[in-house]
């Protein structure tokens, strides 16, 4: 059959049919009858359109070899044979310019004379049966249907055959010729039956003996035999009478399926209230590093030694003072805590041998900041179960917060490139198989795009801090250990650099369960003045601790240096996941890989190299109020990585709930965009489930805002 198709049809038609089948994941060499059917249908569509024009008076005329200078317009726009995206673009354009309703399914042609879409059918069965199937599927009076058969019969909507007798006769003759050619090669019966689905191998295949008994034993309840079950499955229509199926499930279920249209969805309601505040475990875009290059000091690699060396690079220390107090805290204690850290670091330097770790003195300011002796005493339930009014500890509802612009700025900054490399190319052995070669090529390209990304810096910073804190929590349970916040990178010139962001002081950490909390005080350097966005720093007490000279285009300028101090807490399970933040690199690489795979399957070759090296091509990155944002493949890699990193940094029950529930609405909207006629019940219930997760979390609120932008542009 494949040879016949390639001999019988124009090469352009054969190529289009192959492309169409590949787009749907079908193989022309295997599904040869389908290959022949698609070629036949394409040829009929082209013949339907051939020689039909509209002259300058708007009249329909037939021109087979006329004056090339005549002002003629093709009567039919051919939609069949284009790839799906381009076909829908053509359909949308026609609808916008002519005002006709957009069809739910892709039609084959548009008739500019009659101003209507046309669906062409070619059948090996009775024309009226096929016509009814088409009409039931399309469910539109706007689209004209015209069916041809291989026996010379035809059927059209309202018996309106559109074309003149001679044009239709040409199509019927061609179909009859194809049928005769197939019959002479012994291909016709197989081709005819493949549409009707007559005797298939499965129906002739008898299951006997043990397999038959196993099949009968494996039936779902209420089915007496395999035939009984098969008949039910064959007659089952998955989209039919959902209401009826729901009512069979439970007497309480009473759902009416409502059609989901472009006008159905509303935007998510974001909460009102004061702007949301920063809640990450460490500073992100506002962090400041004290750095040493090519470290070679004694004890290099020991955090405390590295930290002291970094501190010595800065000479602008000043007497600290509070410039943005924490509203609920005892702010002088935060000031005293920083002074204590400075004093104890000075003490270390005065010693003959610097210790590897430093445990802070248990001063009143640190005991207050770390919540020492503040936890309510735990009492065994057995000792108090007889108390009449025993009740759970009452906690207030969280205060609603509104979206603030700082979180979008944080995200934008996380997508940017820094001047340092934060990850090395993994040293993995030689590739031994072709698939390994492709995998390492993809990994290398991806690493090159993200190694300098600020989100990658956040990963390495998060891994370091969580590892150090978990180690200290286990090794020094009763001590207030001082933990430097350190990261390592390479400069553009390839020199090693060690960075100090600040310090953590860990509280008591007898962590028995995964969720037991260890308190810590973080003290982080910054050049950001907290008075510019005070709402962002609600949970912080900010000190001014020095002046830093910065090189700018106009020379050196002096800027105040701040210390952001806050009490925070984490648990074993959170630290365990924090230590594994490198997984974010893997997740975003897999997302990029699925994009490469989709491209490669269409082109039938590995597209990794073209994907990363074609710098002129842009890709969709995300939605914004302006529309779909596009960027280079590197920008896509960095954006996907930043999203994954922020999901880790801002992980919360609100994010889990929002992601799970909003995904359902996203799938419904996607089905509508794919013209699948989705139906819903209790849509307001779904909105309620999504919106109850919009409370005060900055990352969730930003995602909800992005979701609203997506809804606006997806349903235009």
From Swiss-Prot:
Its cofactor is Mn(2+). It is found in: Host cytoplasm; Host nucleus. Mn(2+) 2 binds at residues 80, 108. One of its GO terms (molecular function) is RNA binding. The keyword Nuclease applies. This is Polymerase acidic protein. Belongs to the influenza viruses PA family. The gene is PA. Plays an essential role in viral RNA transcription and replication by forming the heterotrimeric polymerase complex together with PB1 and PB2 subunits. The complex transcribes viral mRNAs by using a unique mechanism called cap-snatching. It consists in the hijacking and cleavage of host capped pre-mRNAs. These short capped RNAs are then used as primers for viral mRNAs. The PB2 subunit is responsible for the binding of the 5' cap of cellular pre-mRNAs which are subsequently cleaved after 10-13 nucleotides by the PA subunit that carries the endonuclease activity. A motif (Nuclear localization signal 2 (NLS2)) lies at residues 184-247.
């Amino acid at each position: 059959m494949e040879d016949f198709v390639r001999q019988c049809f124009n090469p352009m038609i054969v190529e289009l049919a192959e492309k169409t089948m590949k787009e749907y994941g079908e193989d022309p060499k295997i599904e040869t009858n389908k290959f022949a059917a698609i070629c036949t249908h394409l040829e009929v569509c082209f013949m339907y359109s051939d020689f039909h024009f509209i002259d300058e008076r708007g009249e329909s005329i037939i021109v087979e070899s006329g004056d090339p200078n005549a002002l003629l317009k093709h009567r039919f726009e051919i939609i069949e044979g284009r790839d799906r995206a381009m076909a829908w673009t053509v359909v949308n354009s026609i609808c916008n310019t002519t005002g006709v309703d957009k069809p739910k399914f892709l039609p084959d042609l548009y008739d500019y004379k009659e101003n209507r879409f046309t669906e062409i059918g070619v059948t090996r069965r009775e024309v009226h049966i096929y016509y009814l199937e088409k009409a039931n599927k399309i469910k539109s009076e706007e689209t004209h249907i015209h069916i041809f058969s291989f026996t010379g019969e035809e059927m059209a909507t309202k018996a309106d055959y559109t074309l003149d007798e001679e044009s239709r006769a040409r199509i019927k003759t061609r179909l009859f010729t194809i049928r005769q050619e197939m019959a002479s090669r012994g291909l016709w019966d197989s081709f005819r039956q493949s549409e009707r689905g007559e005797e298939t191998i499965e129906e002739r295949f008898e299951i006997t003996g043990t397999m038959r008994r196993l099949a009968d034993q494996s039936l779902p309840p209420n089915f007496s035999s395999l035939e009984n079950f098969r008949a039910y499955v064959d007659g089952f229509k998955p989209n039919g009478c959902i209401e009826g199926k729901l009512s069979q499930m439970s007497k309480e279920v009473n759902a009416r399926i409502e059609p989901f249209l472009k006008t159905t969805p509303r935007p998510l309601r974001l909460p009102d209230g004061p702007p949301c505040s920063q809640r990450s475990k460490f500073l992100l875009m506002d962090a400041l590093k004290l750095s040493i290059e090519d470290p070679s000091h004694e004890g290099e690699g020991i955090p405390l030694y590295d930290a002291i060396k970094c501190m010595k690079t800065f000479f602008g220390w000043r007497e600290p003072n509070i410039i943005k107090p924490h509203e609920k805290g005892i702010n002088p204690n935060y000031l005293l805590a920083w002074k204590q850290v400075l004093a104890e670091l000075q003490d270390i330097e005065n010693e003959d041998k610097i210790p590897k770790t430093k445990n802070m003195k248990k001063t009143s300011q640190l005991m207050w900041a770390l919540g020492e002796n503040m936890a309510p005493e735990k009492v065994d339930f057995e000792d108090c179960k007889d108390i009449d009014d025993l009740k759970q500890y009452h906690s207030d509802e969280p205060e609603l917060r509104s979206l603030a612009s700082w979180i979008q700025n944080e995200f934008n900054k996380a997508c940017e490139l820094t001047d340092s490399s934060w990850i090395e190319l993994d040293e993995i052995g030689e590739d031994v198989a072709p698939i390994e070669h492709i995998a390492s090529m993809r990994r290398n390209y991806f690493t090159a795009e993200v190694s300098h990304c600020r989100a990658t810096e956040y990963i390495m910073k998060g891994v370091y801090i969580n590892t150090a804190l978990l180690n200290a929590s286990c090794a020094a349970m009763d001590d207030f250990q001082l933990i430097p916040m350190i990261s390592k990178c390479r400069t553009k010139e390839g020199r090693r650099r060690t960075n100090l962001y600040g310090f953590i002081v860990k509280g008591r950490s007898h962590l028995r369960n995964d969720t037991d909390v260890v308190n810590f005080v973080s003290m982080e350097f910054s050049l950001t003045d907290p008075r510019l966005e005070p709402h962002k720093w609600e949970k912080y007490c900010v000190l001014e601790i020095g002046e830093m000279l910065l090189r700018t285009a106009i020379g050196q300028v002096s800027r105040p240096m701040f210390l952001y101090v806050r009490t925070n807490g984490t648990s074993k399970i959170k630290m365990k996941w924090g230590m594994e933040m490198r997984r974010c690199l893997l997740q975003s690489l897999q997302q990029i890989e699925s994009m490469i795979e989709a491209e490669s399957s269409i082109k039938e070759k590995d597209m990794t190299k073209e994907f990363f090296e074609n710098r002129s091509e842009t890709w969709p990155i995300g939605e914004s109020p302006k529309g779909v944002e596009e960027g280079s493949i590197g920008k896509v890699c960095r954006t996907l990585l930043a999203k994954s990193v922020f999901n880790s940094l801002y992980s919360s029950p609100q994010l889990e709930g929002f992601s799970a529930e909003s995904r359902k609405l996203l799938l419904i909207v996607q089905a509508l965009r794919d013209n699948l006629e989705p139906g819903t019940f209790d849509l307001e219930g779904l909105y309620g489930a999504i919106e109850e997760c919009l409370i005060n979390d900055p990352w969730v609120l930003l995602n909800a805002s992005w979701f609203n932008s997506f809804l606006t542009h997806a349903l235009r």
